[in-house]
Regions:
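Feature primarily recognizes SF3-like P-loop helicase cores of small DNA viruses
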Residues: 1-167
Length: 167
């Protein structure tokens, strides 16, 4: 996860070099009070050429093609409120916990039994995505992104808290 967070004393690109030829990159946990490196996020998710190098190796350039999936309990702080950054962000809330009687201890076997149907749904979803893109996001995702953006905008929060309309 640290490869996508701001570092104030490190400008090396070996983290980027590991993204070469990757399609999906997963990262877990950001920690509290961390900030996105918005420029790096835009660079690696924009489909542009990225210049990087492995440790003690020469630089090389590659076309980034990743989809970044970050699983975290604490969303990193954001300083960039441009459309270029926020169009890349999708917050998918996983609010349900399965404990006690809600926990299905046979879930793996059930999923194995449905594996051909699951694969068919994945293929159908992929075809829909390649034809139409992600235009119809679920309400919960749209709301979570809006909440994240609003919580990140300290200037807007200050104005809402301290400025009153007297007109």
């Amino acid at each position: 996860f640290d490869a996508f967070l701001k570092k104030y004393n490190n400008t090396s690109s070996h983290d980027l070099a590991r993204l070469h030829n990757a399609r999906v990159v997963t990262a877990n946990e950001s920690g509290i009070s961390k900030h996105w490196d918005e420029e790096r996020i835009k660079e690696i998710t924009g489909g542009d050429n990225v210049t990087a190098r492995h440790l003690y190796k020469s630089e090389f350039t590659f076309k980034s093609q990743i989809k970044l999936w970050c699983a975290t309990n604490n969303l990193p702080k954001v300083d960039d409120f441009t459309h270029a950054f926020w169009r890349r962000i999708k917050v998918i809330p996983f609010n349900r916990r399965f404990e006690g009687d809600d926990r299905d201890t046979n879930m793996i076997d059930k999923l194995k039994g449905e594996s051909s149907g699951i694969l068919n749904r994945i293929i159908k979803g992929f075809k829909e995505w390649t034809e139409a893109g992600l235009t119809n996001l679920p309400y919960q995702v749209k709301q979570a992104v809006e909440d994240y953006r609003n919580e990140s905008d300290v200037i807007a929060q200050f104005i809402a808290d301290r400025i009153t309309d007297v007109g």
